[in-house]
Amino acid sequence: MNILAPVRRDRVLAELPQCLKKEAALHVRKDFHPRVTCACQEHRTGTVGFKISKVIVVGDLSVGKTCLINRFCKDTFDKNYKATIGVDFEMERFEVLGVPFSLQLWDTAGQERFKCIASTYYRGAQAIIIVFNLNDVASLEHTKQWLTDALKENDPSNVLLFLVGSKKDLSTPAQYSLMEKDALKVAQEIKAEYWAVSSLTGENVREFFFRVAALTFEANVLADVEKSGARHIADVVRINSDDKNLYLTASKKKATCCP
């Protein structure tokens, strides 16, 4: 019995969402990795469709982490600021290339007094979203420390990084241009994909989370295909080894029976 709710029509991804800036992207391919497309077409995605991928959202107090999540998950924007106490999370279900895929978006507190509590929930993340305020240089400078703290609980080689500038609607074109240069530099240094969004207007929010879902899905399928291939090779080696042992055993038996 399927206990999961059906995937919403606006959460179906048949193509790879593109990056915002090619100079600060995790990759610039126009399509999903060929091995991922092939695995989906041949229904060889293993347990990917049954897994829940964890995404943590970190950043300074009041940079707009909760508003970002709420705009995507609930299509709402609350002008009355309420600080997140500890952690909270939302579950979002997608269908990517015909395969069900779930993201668990963890909204963590930016307040120093809740940092220890929030950090206990960092472990096991497959993607880390570091949010800063496009109108606050200090919040951008603090992103590296947020990343350092998050990576203490995760393997840097197995996690996707996204650097997201929020409150774009409050920036003038000139202000945004200056901040974007600095943000792109930081994104390149930490090997993160850069995005600029507005939770108030919704600008780039949907596109951003679709990109997160697609790249996380792609990474999961590639990892599963790789594991399946490794298991297959191990089985072949084991079978060949067993065959060889059987041959040697038979030869020994034959030798002992000969005069």
UniProtKB/Swiss-Prot annotation:
Enzyme class, spelled out: hydrolase
Resulting phenotype, residue 82 to Q: Abolishes interaction with RILP and localization to the peri-Golgi region
Database matches in SMART domains: RAB, RAN, RAS, RHO
InterPro entries: P-loop_NTPase (IPR027417), Rab (IPR050227), Small_GTP-bd (IPR005225), Small_GTPase (IPR001806)
Keywords per UniProt: Acetylation, Cell projection, Cilium biogenesis/degradation, Cytoplasm, Cytoplasmic vesicle, Cytoskeleton, Golgi apparatus, GTP-binding, Hydrolase, Lipoprotein, Magnesium, Membrane, Metal-binding, Nucleotide-binding, Phosphoprotein, Prenylation, Protein transport, Transport
Outcome of gene disruption: RAB34-deficient embryos display polydactyly, and cleft lip and palate.
Residue ranges of the motif Switch 1: 71-89
Reaction catalyzed: GTP + H2O = GDP + phosphate + H(+)
Highest taxon of the lineage: Eukaryota
Residues binding GTP: 62-66, 78, 81, 84, 110, 167, 169, 198
Cofactors that this protein relies on: Mg(2+)
Post-translational modification Phosphoserine, affected residues: 241
CDD domains in UniProt: Rab36_Rab34
SUPFAM superfamilies: P-loop containing nucleoside triphosphate hydrolases
Compartment annotation: Cytoplasm; Golgi apparatus; Cytoplasmic vesicle, Phagosome; Cytoplasmic vesicle, Phagosome membrane
Signal peptide stretch: none
One Pfam family it belongs to: Ras
Residue positions, PTM N-acetylmethionine: 1
GO MF entry, a single one: GTP binding
Sites of S-geranylgeranyl cysteine lipidation: 257-258
UniProt function note: The small GTPases Rab are key regulators of intracellular membrane trafficking, from the formation of transport vesicles to their fusion with membranes. Rabs cycle between an inactive GDP-bound form and an active GTP-bound form that is able to recruit to membranes different sets of downstream effectors directly responsible for vesicle formation, movement, tethering and fusion. RAB34 transports protein involved in the redistribution of lysosomes to the peri-Golgi region. Plays a role in the maturation of phagosomes that engulf pathogens, such as S.aureus and M.tuberculosis.
Domain comment (free text): Switch 1, switch 2 and the interswitch regions are characteristic of Rab GTPases and mediate the interactions with Rab downstream effectors. The switch regions undergo conformational changes upon nucleotide binding which drives interaction with specific sets of effector proteins, with most effectors only binding to GTP-bound Rab.
Family: Belongs to the small GTPase superfamily. Rab family.
Protein name: Ras-related protein Rab-34
Organism: Mus musculus (Mouse)
Lineage per the UniProt record: Eukaryota, Metazoa, Chordata, Craniata, Vertebrata
